[in-house]
């Protein structure tokens, strides 16, 4: 079945019994082959999924609710299609469990089987004051006003354009390299299944001998606005483009996508696993 098949249809049957078969895997190679870069360098990182509508029954038949976070390693052969995950989570709404640990174990097993890699699952009580659930702020400076003094209108593009990174840039370099940390709230792309817009905040920490031109970086981010790509593929495209242009010694790219169907997706790619940040949640989530 194509990813544009049943999952993309407007009318969907929502299962009321536990249905792990609803989970729909999508090969990461679909997006990585389009990028056409070194796939192994895109395999360092995690996709954090946060689910806010998780519910099941205890043995008294009383509904239980929790917030869940799933960590899918970037080296998994597959991702899970987001609507299929929503259907799967809905399917356990009326399933009885003896403990929270049973729920956690079942979800971890099913997701791991779907993506063919070990998925980390955390469940949080609504009363938890867990720091990872509090509203955070991206590190670095916001570049969303970098073009405020520009007299040139930013054009809409059908595809991301990495050549914008070098537009009007000088060849000046920093001999020892410098770390630039910045973010933008303006990343937008389209879901390739439904064509609905996906909005995200994007954060980058990059150590490079090349100076980061904020105006060019913002133009580049805006070039994604009409691009059809899954969340993970968009972040990997950005990681690949920045790697090739800036030749950084260190690079971290992460995005916090806004929630849809009670689920938000937060991919992160790093040049070294030691650079992996902790999962967090932003104000639009």
UniProtKB/Swiss-Prot annotation:
Reaction catalysed?
Answer: 7-aminomethyl-7-carbaguanine + 2 NADP(+) = 7-cyano-7-deazaguanine + 2 NADPH + 3 H(+)
Q: Which GO terms describe its molecular function?
A: preQ1 synthase activity
Q: Which domain of life is it from?
A: Bacteria
Q: Which UniProt keywords apply?
A: Cytoplasm, NADP, Oxidoreductase, Queuosine biosynthesis
The EC number on file is 1.7.1.13
Q: Which GO terms describe its biological process?
A: queuosine biosynthetic process; tRNA modification
**Residues reported in the UniProt entry to bind NADPH:** 82-83, 260-261
> Which pathway is it part of?
tRNA modification; tRNA-queuosine biosynthesis
Oligomeric state and interaction partners are given as: Homodimer.
Protein's recorded name? NADPH-dependent 7-cyano-7-deazaguanine reductase
Q: What organism, scientifically named, is this protein from? A: Psychrobacter arcticus (strain DSM 17307 / VKM B-2377 / 273-4)
What does the record give as the organism's lineage?
Bacteria, Pseudomonadati, Pseudomonadota, Gammaproteobacteria, Moraxellales
């Amino acid at each position: 079945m194509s990813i544009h098949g049943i999952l993309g249809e407007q009318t969907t049957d929502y299962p009321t019994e536990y249905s792990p078969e609803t989970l729909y895997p999508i090969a990461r190679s679909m997006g990585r082959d389009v990028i056409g870069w070194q796939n192994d360098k895109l395999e360092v990182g995690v996709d954090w999924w946060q689910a806010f509508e998780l519910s099941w029954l205890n043995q008294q038949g009383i509904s239980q609710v929790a917030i869940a976070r799933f960590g899918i390693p970037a080296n998994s052969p597959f991702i899970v299609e987001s609507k299929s995950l929503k259907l799967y989570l809905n399917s356990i709404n009326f399933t009885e469990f003896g403990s929270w640990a049973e729920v956690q174990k079942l979800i971890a097993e099913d997701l791991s089987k779907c993506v063919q890699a070990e998925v980390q699952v955390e469940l949080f009580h609504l009363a938890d004051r867990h720091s990872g659930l509090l509203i955070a702020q991206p590190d670095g400076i916001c570049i969303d006003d970098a073009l405020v003094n520009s007299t040139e209108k930013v054009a809409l593009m059908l595809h991301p354009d990495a050549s914008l990174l070098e537009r009007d840039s000088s060849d000046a370099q920093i001999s020892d390299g410098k770390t630039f940390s910045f973010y933008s709230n303006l990343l937008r792309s389209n879901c390739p299944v439904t064509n609905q817009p996906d909005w995200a905040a994007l954060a980058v920490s990059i150590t490079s001998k090349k100076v980061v031109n904020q105006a060019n970086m913002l133009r580049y981010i805006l070039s994604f606005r009409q691009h059809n790509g899954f969340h993970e593929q968009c972040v990997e495209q950005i990681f690949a483009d920045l790697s090739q242009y800036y030749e950084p010694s260190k690079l971290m790219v992460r995005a916090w996508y806004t929630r849809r169907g009670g689920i938000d997706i937060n991919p992160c790619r790093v040049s070294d696993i030691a650079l992996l940040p902790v999962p967090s949640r932003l104000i639009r989530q």
